[in-house]
From Swiss-Prot:
The gene is rimP. The lineage of its organism: Bacteria, Pseudomonadati, Acidobacteriota, Terriglobia, Bryobacterales. It comes from the Bacteria. It is found in: Cytoplasm. Keywords: Cytoplasm, Ribosome biogenesis. It comes from Solibacter usitatus (strain Ellin6076). Required for maturation of 30S ribosomal subunits. One of its GO terms (cellular component) is cytosol. Gene3D superfamilies: Ribosome maturation factor RimP, C-terminal domain, RimP-like superfamily, N-terminal. One of its GO terms (biological process) is translation. Coiled coil: none annotated. This is Ribosome maturation factor RimP. Belongs to the RimP family. InterPro entries: Ribosome_maturation_RimP, RimP_C, RimP_C_sf, RimP_N, RimP_N_sf.
């Protein structure tokens, strides 16, 4: 049931995001009953505005209500992915080339599962991460368990 709801929300959110010139980053559906939370993350190269979030929220909400896509009550939340956004797609590693990231892989690479460094490239399903000046670790994209940008204070 939860997968069907998530799939429907993704389809609607993708359609709305594209029509508004936005990228759909992620859809999460958590909980159930009256405590269900539907979280949509959107982005665009110049950054997301409050108005972008409001527009997507209004349009997605209207469609979900009209189609009665989510049983019961739910809270709809639309936001930007934030400064420490998740890296979910191969394109993310190319787009954020040169930025700091933290990547956790399923199987150890050189004795470790969690790596931090600067995104140095992405090719043939492999992420290049500069973990020290001149020291590159190659991490298979299909082994990534979790990855996000790291904001430097």
């Amino acid at each position: 049931m939860q997968e069907a709801v998530t799939s429907k929300v993704e389809e609607v959110a993708q359609r709305v995001a594209q029509s508004e010139g936005l990228e759909l980053v992620e859809v999460e559906v958590k909980g159930g009953g009256s405590a269900r939370l539907v979280r949509i993350s959107i982005d665009k190269p110049e950054g997301v505005t409050h108005a972008d979030c409001q527009t997507v929220s209004d349009k997605v909400g209207e469609i979900l209500e009209a189609e009665d896509a989510i049983p019961g009550h739910y809270t709809l939340e639309v936001s930007s992915p934030g400064v420490e956004r998740k890296l979910l797609k191969p394109q993310d590693y190319q787009r954020f080339h040169g930025q700091k990231a933290k990547i956790t892989v399923r199987e150890e690479v050189d004795g470790r599962r969690t790596w931090e460094g600067t995104l140095a490239g992405f090719a043939d399903g492999v992420i290049s991460l500069e973990v020290a000046p001149g020291e590159i670790r190659r991490l298979p994209f299909d082994q990534v368990k979790k990855a996000n940008l790291k904001f430097e204070w």
